[in-house]
């Protein structure tokens, strides 16, 4: 079994970024040795810090599917990848410089502002992140979160981005300019393939997310779980068999994983 999870609004509460209510299920999956693969729009440095707080060292997917990071020597797996420092990396995204070049070309016309245009203080105000975390959020490698003055312009912006080899996805707080060849679903496919090649079979997969950019991930797992937004409303997802958690954030995450583990132990899945 492999669990794939979004962070903000899913494992982490939207309002305070806490995973406190998910600790019972987190401890349970750790004891069982179940891999917990983070799939997020956050940066590598942000995820490294969160993994340390969670007490895990597992594969993770950053910046909306831009790259997959496996710890070197992970479970003795044989993985075709780029070796960099402590990681075995599979890259799907565009270089951040290319992303910024495109932003510079169109930002005045569409009145958009990306993280690269913002001070750390501005990011703190928009995200409620502590200053040191906002600094890590600004250190990007592949994608750009941005705000736009008039959301009616998004469709026109999407068309121009498409012609340049980019696309736009929507997270819980921001729009994101990303490479055309990436999304969370494609990155999840890669992780599943690595486990299959090394285990000899495809493991049962569970995915949890709350936003539009999580839909590609949810389409790639056996058990997709949709976490409600903080206002108790759900993202519109047309996906057969999707499970809707009752509560937002870490409480809904905990309840959903606890129930799935119970069902598996009873032989229901």
From Swiss-Prot:
Optimum pH is 7. Mg(2+) binds at residues 6, 8, 210. GO terms for cellular component: cytosol. Its EC number is 3.1.3.70, 3.1.3.85. Its cofactor is Co(2+); Mg(2+). It holds the Pfam family Hydrolase_3. Divalent metal cations. Can use Mg(2+), Co(2+) and, to a lesser extent, Mn(2+) ions. It is an enzyme of class 3 (hydrolase). The active site is at residue 6. Involved in the biosynthesis of glucosylglycerate. Catalyzes the dephosphorylation of glucosyl-3-phosphoglycerate (GPG) and mannosyl-3-phosphoglycerate (MPG) to glucosylglycerate (GG) and mannosylglycerate (MG), respectively. InterPro entries: HAD-like_sf (IPR036412), HAD-SF-IIB-MPGP (IPR006381), HAD-SF_hydro_IIB (IPR006379), HAD_sf (IPR023214). It catalyses: (2R)-2-O-(alpha-D-glucopyranosyl)-3-phospho-glycerate + H2O = (2R)-2-O-(alpha-D-glucopyranosyl)-glycerate + phosphate; 2-O-(alpha-D-mannosyl)-3-phosphoglycerate + H2O = (2R)-2-O-(alpha-D-mannosyl)-glycerate + phosphate. The keyword Metal-binding applies. One of its GO terms (molecular function) is cobalt ion binding. It comes from Persephonella marina (strain DSM 14350 / EX-H1). One of its GO terms (biological process) is mannosylglycerate biosynthetic process. This is Glucosyl-3-phosphoglycerate/mannosyl-3-phosphoglycerate phosphatase.
